[in-house]
Structure formats: C-alpha cells, structure tokens
C-alpha cells in the first residue's frame, strides 16, 4: 500500500533514521510545505521502501535548492530513496509517480536529485531513467511520466 506522508505524527516517519542517502536532512523538513515522504508498506511497522519528494517549478541542482518550493509545482523531485526488500524501490517509484499524477495534476515532470554514486546510477538507469543533467555534487535523472518507468 502506498502512503503519502505530510505530517510529523505518521508512524512510518520513525524509519527516516534509516535513510542512507541524506541522513542529515531533518524529518520535519521532509514533510514541510511542498514536501512529503512516500512509503510502500503493508503496515506502519514494516515499510518495504521509502522515498522523499519535494515539489518545484524547476529542476534543483543541489540540496539547498530543495528549500525553494513552488506554489504551482510542475516537477516532483525524488531526493532520497531506500528499500528494505529487493525490488521494492522500483515498485515505490512507479506507484509514487502514478499517485502524484492523480493528486498533483500540475506536476508533469519526475526527476531525482541523486548523489554521484555508481549505485544511484545503476538503480535509476536500470529502472528506465535518463540522465537529465550532471551537477557539481549531484545528478538529475529523469523518469518518463507516461509510464511511471
């Protein structure tokens, strides 16, 4: 089941501590205005995968850019993702894209703000993304919005 988390009271936020990509980002920032956490979980005590999403009208090049959210967002930015079970990160991205398209009709672009690591590169390219832009410290991968892949 897909969960979109936008408030600090949700039990799945206890698992933010496991974020291997951007552990320095505080939990309250992840669910503040223009941001949310999406989780794939059958219950609130056992997530399969989690991703943090920020909404913008541009493609951010660095973590500091995540502070600038849009009133009418056109771009969903996946800025950290991790999974507890094989294949569930991919499943979460597909379901999150579909859910965001339904709940945020102004969003028509799906990109990442990924670290420059081989693991991130393999994950996103294997799951159908293209490299949109290489930045100083990050890479923006872009997903096809028609299929969610």
Can you describe what each PLM-predicted range is?
Residues 83-102:
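Conserved acetyl-CoA-binding loop-helix of GNAT-fold acetyltransferases
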Residues 39, 47, 96-107, 111-115:
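Preference for well-ordered, secondary-structure-rich cores of eukaryotic proteins
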Residues 52-76:
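Conserved acyl-donor/pantetheine-binding loop and adjacent beta-alpha core of acyl/acetyltransferases
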Residues 83, 110-122, 137:
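Conserved beta-strand-loop-alpha-helix junction that forms the acyl-donor binding cleft
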Residues 125-135:
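Conserved acetyl-CoA-binding loop of GNAT-fold acetyltransferases
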Residues 136-149:
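C-terminal "cap" of GNAT-fold acetyltransferases
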Residues 26-49, 54-57:
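A short helix-loop-beta-strand connector motif used in the catalytic cores of GNAT acetyltransferases and
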Residues 1-31:
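Short amphipathic alpha-helix that is part of the acyltransferase structural core
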